[in-house]
Structure formats: structure tokens, C-alpha cells
Amino acid sequence: MSKEKGIFLIDAVYEKNKESFIKKITGLVKKRRIIGYAGYSSRKDLEKNLLWQVFDENSPDKNFDFDKKKVKKIVKETLRKCLKEVNEKPYVFIFPSYSTFTKLKMGGVGGNFSKHNVMLIFVNTSAKMWEYSLKETLCHEFVHVVSPYYNPWENTIGERIVFEGIAENFQENVLKGRRSIFSKILKEKDCKEIFKKVVNKINSKNSKEHDRFFYGGKKYKRWTGYSLGYLLIKKYLKKNKNIGWISIIHKNPNKILEEIRKDL
């Protein structure tokens, strides 16, 4: 395991035995007084997360070269850019990812919030665009972990639309590059219609309803919630040109949503 000022790089050679492999990786994560086990209160909870984020017995890339030096360099450089906008330094735990979905659908990099100020990043360096995807994911998750309101287990669909929209716009602004795959699903003209479809679920905390709206299902295309959030917040930022990133990230998402709904 490699670490440097809140950046923890965890690596382990792939094993066919799922339980053994996950226990090996979680065994490399020490308990810390403020954040526990990478943001989780127990190793068991961390293991549950890593089982689907890291392990994939059908992965074609069980022996890819996890370039720790390059990964760390990208993480440090990207975080430096984020901190220029919002000076709240997070803990970052980086793991290799053997997930086929992460490689094929997410550019080789996935990430999630585990606790306020703690993010987990999962990297497959055999994916073609993994380096840029790593930058995108870091910027996106940075917004989530420094927000005083973000909690994926408690947030409503409406709050989540706002959070994902802020994260996507922040990422685009910081990297000054292309739009992410998540933001391209919808066009601006689609926003009103999609919002009407989901408005009766706007206060829902039901995880299945969240999954259908953000990750796709019969009614919605994959990444619909992300794309809707991106477009709505893009419009909101144009209208509120003087609002800075610190202000919008620390603003109650329900107040933002209320303002957005008036303009739809």
C-alpha cells in the first residue's frame, strides 16, 4: 500500500477466490480514528462495497499492470486543481478494479462516497481512456465528499439530481475539457419532459427508484439522472453567474431545486 497525505493506494494480486481476495485488500486498509476503514465503520462494511466494485470473476483483465506511479501523479495533480476552487482536502483511497462494467461502460474508472470527506476510487489501467476518466471521477466525487448535504443513503431523487449536476459541471469547469459520458444522454429540450416524468418521485429515497432513474431501466436510459442534473445546473449557473463553487456546493440542494423548478 502506498500513501501520501490523505492519498492511499491499495493494491493486491488478483485471486480467483472472491472472499480471500477481498479480505486481502481490506486487510491493507488500516482503521483511522476519524474515518474508520476508508470511511466505513467496520471491515465487513468495506468488504461489501469492494465485492461489487473490485471483484469480477468474469473480468478479462485479471493481470493488468496497475501503474501506481502514474495513478498517484494524476490523483495529486487533479486534486490540486480541485483544491484551488474549494480548499477542503479529502481522503482518497484508490483500488484496482477488475469490474467489466467499469472498464467497458465507465472508461476504466469508478468511484463512490463512503463518508463525508472520504472517497473510494476504482481503476482499471487497461482501459483505453483510464487516465482522463480518473481525472473526471476525482473531480466528480470531490464535490460529493466535501458537500455538507450529500449522503447517498438519505438523499432524495431531487437532491441527487442537484448533486450530480453540480459534480458534472464542476468537473467540466476544472478540467476544461470534454463533457463526460454521463452528461450527454439528454438534450436541453428533453429536460422539461423528463422532469415531469420523475416529479412524483422527487422526494423518494427508495434505492430501486434511484437506480432506475440514474443507472437506467425500462423507463429511463442509463445515466438519465446525471444528464438531467448536468443540464439543469448548467442553466442555473448561467442565470447565477456570480455564484462560486464553494457557495453552490454548500447551498441546500432543495433550495436550488426550488429555484430550478420555477424556470422549467
Q: What is each of the regions a protein language model found here?
A:
Residues 1-69:
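N-terminal low-structure segments adjacent to metalloprotease catalytic domains
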Residues 59-116:
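Auxiliary, metal-adjacent structural segments of Zn-dependent hydrolase domains
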Residues 135, 159, 163, 225:
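Hydrophobic (often cysteine-bearing) scaffold residues that line and stabilize catalytic clefts
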Residues 136-149, 168:
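Active-site recognition of the HExxH zinc-binding catalytic motif
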Residues 122-137, 158:
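Short pre-active-site segment immediately N-terminal to the catalytic Zn-binding motif
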Residues 2-9, 157-197:
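Post-HExxH zinc-binding segment in Zn-dependent metallohydrolases
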Residues 149-157, 176-182, 239-244:
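Inter-helical turn/loop segments and adjacent helix faces that build the functional surface
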Residues 29-30, 200-264:
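Pan-zinc metallopeptidase signature
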